[in-house]
């Protein structure tokens, strides 16, 4: 049984009501419930955290190593374009991760085109709405099966 951690960055607690034309109408609670169910059905354990505070996400990444987390799925949200500290935390713990974005960041403002995570992530999923989280989970579980 693997343990997976899903991290949601700033403002994702507002999903379902925040700019639904961009981010969809699915709530964060619905996303988390779906991922928990899918992981459980596959025989795995899924943890999740949403925070608007960079340091809380960093602390959670550090704790993940001590807890034996096998894979991280992260939507860094606005921290994607600004947080060297989150990038360094992910590199420090050496836990593979997939970067997820609900919107297609490449169709948005130019400042959103740069990610501090993409070049060190196992993969990046963007623009598929809440489905992107499900696809990230499926990919993570598949990768954990590999020798």
UniProtKB/Swiss-Prot annotation:
Record-listed substrate binding positions: 75, 81, 88, 102-103, 112
GO biological process, alphabetically ordered: amino acid biosynthetic process; aromatic amino acid family biosynthetic process; chorismate biosynthetic process; quinate catabolic process
Keywords: Amino-acid biosynthesis, Aromatic amino acid biosynthesis, Lyase
Domain of life: Bacteria
Active-site residues from the entry: 23 (proton acceptor), 101 (proton donor)
Catalytic reactions on record: 3-dehydroquinate = 3-dehydroshikimate + H2O
GO molecular function: 3-dehydroquinate dehydratase activity
The keyword Amino-acid biosynthesis is annotated on this UniProt entry: yes
Listed pathway(s): Metabolic intermediate biosynthesis; chorismate biosynthesis; chorismate from D-erythrose 4-phosphate and phosphoenolpyruvate: step 3/7
A Pfam short name: DHquinase_II
Feature type site, description Transition state stabilizer: 18
CDD domains reported in the protein's UniProt record: DHQase_II
InterPro entries, A to Z: DHquinase_II, DHquinase_II_CS, DHquinase_II_sf
EC annotation from Swiss-Prot or TrEMBL: 4.2.1.10
Subunit structure of this chain's protein: Homododecamer.
Protein family (similarity comment): Belongs to the type-II 3-dehydroquinase family.
Role description: Catalyzes a trans-dehydration via an enolate intermediate.
Family annotation (NCBIfam families): aroQ, PRK05395.1-1, PRK05395.1-2, PRK05395.1-3, PRK05395.1-4
Protein name: 3-dehydroquinate dehydratase 1
Organism per entry: Pseudomonas aeruginosa (strain ATCC 15692 / DSM 22644 / CIP 104116 / JCM 14847 / LMG 12228 / 1C / PRS 101 / PAO1)
């Amino acid at each position: 049984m693997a343990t997976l951690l899903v991290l949601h960055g700033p403002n994702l607690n507002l999903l379902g009501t925040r700019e639904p034309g961009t981010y969809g109408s699915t709530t964060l609670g619905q996303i988390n419930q779906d991922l928990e169910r899918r992981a459980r059905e596959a025989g795995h354990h899924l943890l999740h955290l949403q925070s608007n505070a960079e340091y809380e996400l960093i602390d959670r990444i550090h704790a993940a190593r001590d807890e034996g987390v096998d894979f991280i799925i992260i939507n860094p949200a606005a921290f994607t374009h600004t947080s060297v500290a989150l990038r360094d935390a992910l590199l420090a713990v050496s836990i593979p991760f997939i970067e997820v974005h609900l919107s297609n960041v490449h169709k948005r403002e130019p400042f959103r085109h740069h990610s501090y995570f993409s070049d060190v992530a196992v993969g990046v999923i963007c623009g598929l709405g809440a489905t992107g989280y499900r696809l990230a989970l499926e990919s993570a579980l598949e990768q954990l099966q590999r020798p």
